[in-house]
Amino acid sequence: MRLWKSMAWGILLWHSQSGALCPAWPPARAAEEIARLQQQLADWNDIYWKQGVSAVDDSVYDQLSARLVQWQRCVGQDVSSTPVSPPLNGTTMHPVAHTGVRKLADRQAVEQWMRGRSELWVQPKVDGVAVTLVYQNGKLARAISRGNGLQGEDWTPKIRLIPSIPQTTQGALANAVLQGEIFLQREGHIQQRMGGMNARSKVAGMLMRQDNASALNSLGIFIWAWPDGPANMPERLSQLAKAGFSLTKKYSLAVKNASEVERARQSWLTSALPFVTDGVVIRMAKEPASQHWRPGQGDWLAAWKYPPVAQVAQVSAIQFSVGKSGKITVVASLVPVILDDKRVQRVNIGSVKRWEAWDIAPGDQILVSLAGQGIPRLDEVVWRSRERSKPVPPDSHFNSLTCFYASETCQEQFISRLVWLGSRSALGLDGMGEASWRALHQTHRFEHIFSWLALTSAQIANTPGFAKGKSEQIWRQFNLARRQPFTRWIMAMDIPLTQAALQASGDRSWEQLLMRTEQHWRQLPATGERRAGRVIDWRDNPQIKTLSRWLAAQHIPGFGS
């Protein structure tokens, strides 16, 4: 299928500002779009933390939050109001602030961050809900949600119902503050294959609801910080393990360079783990005294997240393609995103009817993943732009019997037919892709799909963009095509039969084909009444008849008398 480029419709120009892609919106529209997305995120955030219900996938929420920050920076707007953390409903102060963790984009960023730092350890970045555990006199005294990092909600009653969280401690941990992640316990969770499973939202939901005490049995705890704990990391891990926080020791590895971090990251991505993860955290063994911890200022640790299985992508244009059979397909052009090291800048939406049902317009944010063989796939529309400017699709009069001859309205189906006849399923013209066919047709103005047979070597050589070697190769391919058997030419003319059925018919000339009845076609493999009728319609089509006579004049095998 080829792009109906004259019908392509784009709305956004993009420019770079501080390394980020910015939409070229008028100020009024930028303010409106930012306000709408900000409000939507705030609504989702409120539902998530107050009701324990996720109205949107965790990854989608995170990516749209990042998109909002990007837009705010593009227009020089303060990003402090971005709703990426829980609403501050709780008033319980944390004994030690939650610093959060800086995100590193790639291995190069990891190398830069590690440079000059020593005694480094890597841990899986467990995906759940952050909590502070306060032990006093050997007993769990308080449990506080992360909140804004300085204060949160008192979760003590719920946390005491989670069997995996020790209720008593001894020794140095008898009076201690711990920070960690409450997670959904999994058996043999392979992150690469199973994904995030919206684990964070599920945990939040269990902690928010009042009627599900039994569900808390499925929660676990991963301690990632012991403020003012033992300075020696192995000693710290050993004491945590003895106290019942064994996962921290099991999943903490000393690392010296980015290669070791990358190796651990890949291993945890592909191995069976007892929890969902979304990357790794690298941390220094030596930490500042707890009184110096502040939200957003934890420069002794950093995260290297896994690339998302699906990416939120901005639709930059809607285009239509018309295949050789006349089928119109809608394609969304995207501001490029990276999925599994693949640059994705377009995704097939499907038919016009499906596109209309999806209600996708330029400016919308869609979720894209990779299906089998790395083909981009549209998963859902996660955010719609206020402006709904959509292109008008081409007329739907195209079908399997149109555009054997070139015309202004037939350009795309005509090109699709040329691409088809040059494919290995037809004449096998090596090196003849869409770009080559477009160049030849644009220069020499083909009358019909076989007009290229009349080109001279000089005409091909004079085609703009064709080097000498390429033009000579095309000339050879065109001459070799003349020797192809009759059945290959019939396939090039898009007879509605499979190659197996055509071979079974035994026809080796146009004259034989004209003598066949509908009953004959019905008896061929994979050819029923409907397909047999289509063969008759194809054979009797005036354009097909004219092409057969033209091929006869060119002395193509099977078409002459």
UniProtKB/Swiss-Prot annotation:
Catalytic activity line of the entry: NAD(+) + (deoxyribonucleotide)n-3'-hydroxyl + 5'-phospho-(deoxyribonucleotide)m = (deoxyribonucleotide)n+m + AMP + beta-nicotinamide D-nucleotide
Domain of life: Bacteria
Gene Ontology molecular function: any one: DNA ligase (NAD+) activity
UniProt-annotated catalytic positions: 125
InterPro entries with a match to the protein in the record: DNA_ligase_AS, DNA_ligase_B, DNA_ligase_CS, DNAligase_adenylation, DNAligase_N, NA-bd_OB-fold, NAD_dep_DNA_ligaseB, NAD_DNA_ligase_OB
EC number: 6.5.1.2
Top EC class, one word: ligase
UniProt-listed SUPFAM superfamilies: DNA ligase/mRNA capping enzyme, catalytic domain, Nucleic acid-binding proteins, RuvA domain 2-like
Keywords, comma-separated and alphabetical: DNA damage, DNA repair, DNA replication, Ligase, NAD
Gene Ontology terms describing biological process: DNA repair; DNA replication
NCBIfam families, per the entry: PRK08097.1
Role: Catalyzes the formation of phosphodiester linkages between 5'-phosphoryl and 3'-hydroxyl groups in double-stranded DNA using NAD as a coenzyme and as the energy source for the reaction.
Stated family: Belongs to the NAD-dependent DNA ligase family. LigB subfamily.
Record protein name field: DNA ligase B
